[in-house]
A protein has these predicted regions:
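The canonical Cys-X-X-Cys-His
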Residues: 24-30, 82, 117-126, 183
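The feature marks the first
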Residues: 14, 18-60
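Axial heme c-ligation environment in periplasmic c-type cytochrome domains
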Residues: 35-41, 56-99, 132-138, 156-190
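Electrostatic cytochrome c docking/interface patches
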Residues: 4-21, 35-38, 88-114
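Sequence context surrounding c-type heme c attachment/ligation sites in exported
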Residues: 15-22, 47, 51, 111-121, ...
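Short, solvent-exposed interaction modules
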Residues: 95-136, 144
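Detector for the c-type heme attachment site
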Residues: 26-34, 87-88, 123-129, 188
Length: 191
């Protein structure tokens, strides 16, 4: 069926997906828990969000240089199965830099209302678990380096697959480098 955004709703088979993720494991880990801080953890991420990212990467709507050509030849069902597999896994937890926790938590929970920046909790939940029905990703436990890179990419207009509302670009424009460092560290330790 088609959802509000016109994307087909994920109808993946996690068991089938397990057999299709071997190549993914080199960067993202066999269970979706990347050991490299610049590659995102996919484990436990919402199926809808994962499927959107896979489709955007495959179509070129989201440029991810290390994934160039990796999804070529994969069917819609393959992508749905891969998304279902990673969504069914448990994300490993990380730790925040204690020196950055207070600032990161203040941004995550309170935003910068004086600058029109809402709290992250509104879309990504107070625990960072996201909202898969709305397509908002889980952030809690994600690698801080990866989160920092994505926030920077949104801020600089390098990443633009946040929809017509440009919500993440508008939010990231209000973040300084110090804000991004604190927020991404806090998110890494959030679970």
């Amino acid at each position: 069926t088609l959802g509000m955004t016109g994307l087909a709703q994920a109808a993946g088979d996690a068991a089938a997906g397990q057999g299709k993720v071997a190549v993914c494991g080199a960067c993202h880990g066999a269970d979706g828990n990347s050991m490299a801080p610049t590659f995102p953890k996919l484990a436990g991420q919402g199926e809808r969000y994962l499927l959107k990212q896979l489709n955007d990467i495959k179509s070129g709507a989201r440029a991810v240089v290390p994934m160039t050509g990796m999804l070529t030849g994969m069917s819609d069902q393959d992508l749905q199965d891969i998304a279902a597999y990673f969504a069914s896994q448990n994300m490993s937890v990380g730790a925040a830099d204690p020196a950055l926790v207070a600032r990161g938590e203040a941004l995550f929970r309170g935003g910068k209302l004086d600058q029109g920046m809402p709290a992250c909790t509104g879309c990504h939940s107070p625990t960072g678990s996201g909202n898969d029905a709305a397509g908002f990703p889980q952030l809690g436990g994600q690698h801080g380096d990866y989160v920092a890179l994505q926030l920077t990419n949104f801020r600089e207009g390098v990443r633009t697959n946040d929809g017509d509302t440009k919500i993440m670009r508008a939010i990231a424009e209000k973040l300084s480098n110090k804000d991004i460092a604190a927020l991404s560290s806090y998110i890494q330790g959030l679970h």
